[in-house]
């Protein structure tokens, strides 16, 4: 019996092992039932690292095992107690004996061991289907294995029971908010972790249409430049992760915080040491589909992601803002913190945990972390403000690396979170609680003409290129400028060239030469000068209209004022800065005082404005075309005086204008009658009750071609606007094939005549003006090179501008001297009509002086007209006599007496 008891005790380990293992492996049916019993047992909720065998074999388990398992007590039970030497010995491997010294683990060794144990227990638990991802341990570890683990877990979940279907729902049905709001849902741990994983996977795997990894290249470029902003296209996010794109505008603050954390992990996975440069990566959202106007922002936009546009009118300096703040207890010098400072409220400690005192507390300047802070104000773009409305403005906050991304005068697109904050001054002013609103910027993009070109469709581009191949496109564009204004072809030609503009040059980044063409209109009252400016304001993509009487020097350039809240000096942009890359229109230019007028000298030539006030020394861009209108001294233009004697402007300001247009109100019975008919017909045609021609007033062909115009059909105004935008952005004409000798000869001739007549001074600026106008004429035809025709047109415009500013006594002789330049692209009939009108005017003056009255019929001998025509190389007048131009001006021929008659 002693031997049997010894053998029983010696074989007890083997017996215990067999009792556990044999029933589970006896048959496949039993194993499946046993697995069900295991997964549903109370041991599922036991804490880790405990002996789980007690939970697996509970009180109910053995009862089922005795019914279904093998019979252990019987005739063959002695076999269970037979000695098996290899199984009757405990394993000694890995066990430390009592007499052995065990070395104490270091911190790194202990951490590695615990990581291995956690990995083992996690795999063991998942193998049994007992635990879900992220519940036992922090699932933020081993990020490199997560995508693969996630796929394996989803595959296992499809094969397991109802318990694991809940896990699939939490991953696949993230859009099911379960009755919560979006902001509450994304703040929970489960959805927050899933959003983190999805966005991280999006950054790692998103490819473009060519198969290139988009964000790998962007992150590489970002790290090369040591930046901390990663731009994500909202359209790409919506295409891949539509749930995240749905959550983002509703809860932007929470989502962007998760995105920033995920982006930082992706960046550190690619560049592990990038945290030495920055500890934060900011995800910037671009191309948000819906663009809101500043005046349309309402309370429903609060705390949502919005996209708006406007012009920056003022900006503060870059200030340090508290990010992570630490406090010193003044009584015990204990350091409290760090406290994360948010934009909405100030965080202050209540009591000191060391001495239990309630303060006072001082900010620890050395250990506190700051971030960059800048406040800007954006205003609605001038072209988007409805008539009679004041432009709205809104403040925006730029943080981190967004500071100094724009300056006053820039037109920007701003994506950010629309916040409200408490403002005590508003409560005092209104008498009841209201909140001020502000935009916390997330992404800032400068707008230029490329955005305008991007709005053109393929059909528009095809139509524009087709129009450029028309031989008469130049005349059509000239005729399309202000078609509701009668006559003034030279002014329309100059304004058309100014709208297209030349090409700016900056050789080596040292000296910048402007490409914009400045135009000055001067003449008698009632000659449509202001109407021309108003027309340019409508047809230009970006225009600022101001008057000389109401504009001061700082109103035109820029000024410095103290911010009412922060009490610091801020820079405010004036009209010329706001019109950057556009047109600045100044009416009543002569009403400005000299001090205000000299302030725009730099803006008109160097196209920049230097500010040195209140400690702010800077330079702002003013790359705009200046078109001004002025009245002569005394109200009417005196042709017996030169231009500079008629206008109260100094020579430096006159020489900065490329084109000078003199508008004179001369008495001509025929022209006056035609003008009156034109005006009356225009009023009748555009009356609101006239429904028949309603379509023409909305951008169609406004007026029929008049005989004194270019004789071609004008372009619709919308087509003209698109044509100008396309030409200014896509065409860059070069001067390779330009006739330089012709320009040099003409410049020397102009200098001689200028010195002899004492009229406006001719300077080197006029050579640059001719080059700019030649480039503008080439751009008008969408040509890449300046041709001889472009140079001839520029010389003709320059000559007409120069001759119109002369005294009447020298104007005729000068026209004869420069006739070869003035005759370019002019129809012979136009030249002959001009000569014939001069002969009629001389005859009218003769009759008034001799008879004291004017006769109803003026007779001009054909021989006089023939002699004048031969001087400009025109020998055949039959085509002129048969033309409509001859008949429309009420001329007729008496063939017997060989006279030309005009009836008044």
Curated annotation (Swiss-Prot):
Residue ranges spanning the membrane: these are none
- Give me the ranges of the annotated region Disordered: 1-166
Q: Which residues hold ADP? A: 530-531
Extract the GO molecular function terms from the UniProt entry: ATP binding; ATP hydrolysis activity; DNA replication origin binding; enzyme binding; helicase activity; histone binding; zinc ion binding
Q: Which gene encodes it?
A: Mcm2
On subunit structure and binding partners, the annotation says: Component of the MCM2-7 complex. The complex forms a toroidal hexameric ring with the proposed subunit order MCM2-MCM6-MCM4-MCM7-MCM3-MCM5. Component of the CMG helicase complex, a hexameric ring of related MCM2-7 subunits stabilized by CDC45 and the tetrameric GINS complex. Interacts with DBF4. Interacts with KAT7. May interact with MCM10. Component of the replisome complex composed of at least DONSON, MCM2, MCM7, PCNA and TICRR. Forms a co-chaperone complex with DNAJC9 and histone H3.3-H4 heterodimers.
Entry's localization field: Nucleus; Chromosome
Q: Does the keyword Cell cycle apply?
A: yes
Instruction: Supply the name of the protein.
Output: DNA replication licensing factor MCM2
* Phosphoprotein as UniProt keyword: yes
Q: What catalytic activity does the UniProt entry give for this protein?
A: ATP + H2O = ADP + phosphate + H(+)
Residues bearing N6-acetyllysine are 216
What is the top EC class of this enzyme, as a single word? hydrolase
Family assignment from sequence similarity: Belongs to the MCM family.
């Amino acid at each position: 019996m002693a031997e049997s008891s010894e053998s029983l005790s010696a074989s007890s380990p083997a017996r215990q092992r067999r009792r556990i293992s044999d029933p589970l492996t006896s048959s496949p049916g039993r194993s499946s039932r046993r697995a069900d019993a295991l997964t549903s047992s109370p041991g599922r909720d036991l804490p880790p690292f405990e002996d789980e065998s007690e939970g697996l074999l509970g009180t109910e388990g053995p009862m089922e095992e005795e019914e279904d398992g093998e019979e252990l007590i019987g005739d063959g039970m002695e076999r269970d107690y037979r000695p098996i030497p290899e199984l009757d010995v405990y394993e000694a491997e890995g066990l430390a004996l009592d007499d052995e010294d065990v070395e104490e683990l270091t911190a790194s060794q202990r951490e590695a061991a615990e990581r291995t144990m956690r990995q083992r227990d996690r795999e063991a638990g998942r193998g049994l289907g007992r635990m879900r991802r992220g519940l036992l341990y922090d699932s933020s570890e081993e990020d490199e294995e997560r995508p693969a683990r996630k796929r394996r877990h989803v595959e296992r979940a499809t094969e397991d029971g109802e318990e694991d279907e809940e896990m699939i729902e939490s991953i696949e049905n993230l859009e099911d908010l379960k009755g919560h709001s979006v902001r509450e849902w994304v703040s929970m741990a489960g959805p927050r972790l899933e959003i983190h994983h999805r966005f991280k996977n999006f950054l790692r795997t998103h490819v473009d249409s060519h198969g290139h990894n988009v964000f790998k290249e962007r992150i590489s470029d970002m790290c090369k430049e040591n930046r901390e902003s990663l731009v994500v296209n909202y359209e790409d996010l919506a295409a891949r992760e539509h749930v995240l794109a749905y959550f983002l505008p509703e809860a932007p603050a929470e989502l962007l915080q998760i995105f920033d954390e995920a982006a930082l992990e992706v960046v550190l996975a690619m560049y592990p040491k990038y945290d030495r440069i920055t500890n934060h990566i900011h995800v910037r959202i671009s191309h948000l589909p819906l663009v809101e106007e500043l005046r349309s922002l309402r309370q429903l936009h609060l705390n949502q992601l919005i996209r708006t546009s406007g012009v920056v009118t003022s900006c503060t300096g870059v200030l340090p803002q508290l990010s992570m703040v630490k406090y010193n207890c003044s009584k015990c010098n204990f350091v409290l913190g760090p406290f994360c400072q948010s934009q909405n409220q100030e965080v202050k400690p209540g009591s000191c945990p060391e001495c239990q005192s309630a303060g006072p507390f001082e900010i620890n300047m050395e250990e506190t972390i700051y971030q960059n802070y800048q406040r800007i104000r954006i205003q609605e773009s001038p072209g988007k403000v409805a008539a009679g409305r004041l432009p709205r403005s809104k403040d925006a906050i730029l943080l981190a690396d967004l500071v100094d991304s724009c300056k006053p005068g820039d037109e920007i697109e701003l994506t950010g979170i629309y916040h409200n904050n408490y403002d005590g001054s508003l409560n005092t002013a209104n008498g009841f609680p209201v909140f001020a609103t502000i935009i916390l910027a997330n992404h800032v993009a400068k707008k230029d003409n490329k955005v305008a070109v991007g709005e053109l469709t393929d059909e528009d581009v095809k139509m524009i290129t087709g129009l450029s191949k028309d031989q008469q496109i130049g005349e059509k564009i000239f005729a399309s400028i202000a078609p509701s204004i009668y006559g003034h072809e030279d002014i329309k030609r100059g304004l058309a060239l100014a709208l297209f503009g030349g090409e700016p040059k900056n050789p080596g980044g040292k000296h910048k030469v402007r490409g914009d063409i400045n135009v000055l209109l001067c003449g008698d009252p009632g000659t449509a000068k202001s109407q021309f400016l108003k027309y340019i304001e409508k047809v230009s993509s970006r225009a600022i209209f101001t008057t000389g009487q109401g504009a001061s020097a700082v109103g035109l350039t820029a000024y410095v004022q103290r911010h009412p809240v922060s009490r610091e000096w801020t820079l405010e942009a004036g009209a010329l800065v706001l019109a950057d890359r556009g047109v600045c229109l100044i009416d009543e230019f002569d009403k400005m005082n000299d001090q205000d007028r000299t302030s725009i000298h730099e803006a008109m030539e160097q196209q920049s404005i230097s500010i040195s006030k209140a400690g702010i020394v800077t330079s702002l861009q003013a790359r705009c075309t200046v078109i001004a209108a002025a009245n002569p001294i005394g109200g009417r233009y005196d042709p017996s005086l030169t231009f500079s004697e008629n206008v109260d402007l100094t020579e430096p300001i006159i020489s900065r204008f490329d084109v000078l247009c003199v508008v004179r109100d001369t008495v001509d019975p025929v022209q006056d009658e035609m003008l009156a008919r034109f005006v009356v017909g225009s009023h009748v045609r555009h009356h609101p009750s006239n429904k028949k021609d309603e379509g023409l007033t909305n951008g169609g062909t406004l007026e029929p071609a008049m005989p004194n115009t270019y004789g071609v059909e004008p372009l619709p105004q919308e087509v003209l606007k698109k044509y100008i935008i396309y030409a200014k952005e896509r065409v860059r004409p070069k001067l390779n094939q330009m006739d330089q000798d012709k320009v040099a000869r003409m410049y020397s001739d102009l200098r001689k005549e200028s010195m002899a007549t004492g009229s406006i001074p001719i300077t080197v600026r006029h050579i640059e003006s001719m080059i700019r106008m030649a480039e503008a004429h080439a751009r008008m035809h969408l040509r890449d090179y300046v041709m001889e025709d472009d140079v001839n047109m520029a010389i003709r415009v320059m000559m007409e501008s120069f001759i119109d500013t002369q005294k009447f006594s020298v104007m005729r002789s000068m026209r004869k001297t420069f006739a070869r330049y003035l005759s370019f692209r002019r129809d012979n009939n136009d030249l002959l009509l001009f000569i014939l009108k001069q002969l009629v005017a001389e005859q009218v003056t003769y009759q008034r002086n001799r008879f004291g009255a004017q006769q109803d019929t003026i007779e001009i001998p054909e021989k006089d007209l023939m002699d004048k025509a031969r001087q400009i190389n025109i020998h055949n007048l039959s085509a002129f006599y048969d033309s409509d131009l001859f008949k429309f001006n009420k001329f007729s021929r008496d063939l017997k007496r060989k006279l030309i008659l005009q009836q008044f």
